[in-house]
Amino acid sequence: MDLYTFTLQYPSFLFPGKTQYAEGPAPADLKIVRCINSTNPFNWRDVARHISREHYDLAVFAYWMSFFAPCYTALARRLKKTSCIALVHNMMPHEKSLLDKVLPPSFVKTMDGFVALSRSVLEDVAKMDKAQKPKAWSPHPVYDHFGAIEPRENALEHLGLDPQYRYLLFFGLVRAYKGLDWLIEAFADERLRKYPLRLLVAGEFYEDKEPYLKAIQSYGLGDAVVIRDAFIPDEQVKDYFNAADIVVQPYKSATQSGVTQIAYHFEKPMLVTNVGGLEEIVPNGVVGYAVEPDPRHIANALLDFFEHDRYADFVRNLRVEKEKYSWEKLANVILNLK
């Protein structure tokens, strides 16, 4: 198996972050070929020729936004002797534009089949696939490459966090649809003030941070919200999850999320909103909470978690539930797609 990735993934005007490149070493046990320029049609031709010469039986295209449709379409059209399967994270992005109606249909036509990472995404694919090609869904496997479960105290020390507090973790890029504003409002609920809590926001802001800072100030939260506005490198991910008591994803819209699968690996209870495919992965009352998407329901779940000390029960269940999400199972779904 060979992995083909990008020399240029996004042009700078589409990428609001500080860098789109991983700074750590590449995995030593994988053959990774950096050769795809997402914006250069001449490059697509050359890459397709190279891939064709390798005579692969199967090519899996990881698809998550419409921007990549022209590049992927051009590659797939030239791989005439290779079966092309789309591994679909999102068929339609969370923040839609006119291009999201124009670009995906051509990509869908060039694929021989589809594996979606949630039922809701599978439904989106089915609406676009007029040829009724083979398709299935399989949840994203657990992300197990970020390190081991370690003592909470060690993680807090590494992050410079006070161990007298319990931590709610909001992890990942901050965008409007992810509902951090709802979480801040929920966290300000007076019923939670009797507990020693801190909200830890770890991720780069992809939009104006000022409205969030104003909300924190207006609710009088002050030092109760700790913000680490930066892309979190792989080697630091374990500290944030090992430090957390609960991982909160208060999304306003979603299909599925890799954050849940990191939380499963580190056996951390989760609070998600019941939008998209999130509640498929986080059964309510088993490994955490799947609640209505509004601040009041989020606050109610947080209160239940800390008031009734649900942590140990959820962790026991997490150890059982996470066995469902193996990479072998996803591979079998892809290989058996008919």
Regions found by a protein language model. Give the residues of each.
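Acidic donor-binding loop of glycosyltransferase active sites
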Residues: 239-255, 268
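Donor nucleotide-sugar binding/catalytic pocket of nucleotide-sugar-dependent glycosyltransferases
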Residues: 109-149, 336
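Conserved donor-binding/catalytic core segment of Leloir-type glycosyltransferases
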Residues: 161-178, 184-187, 199-200
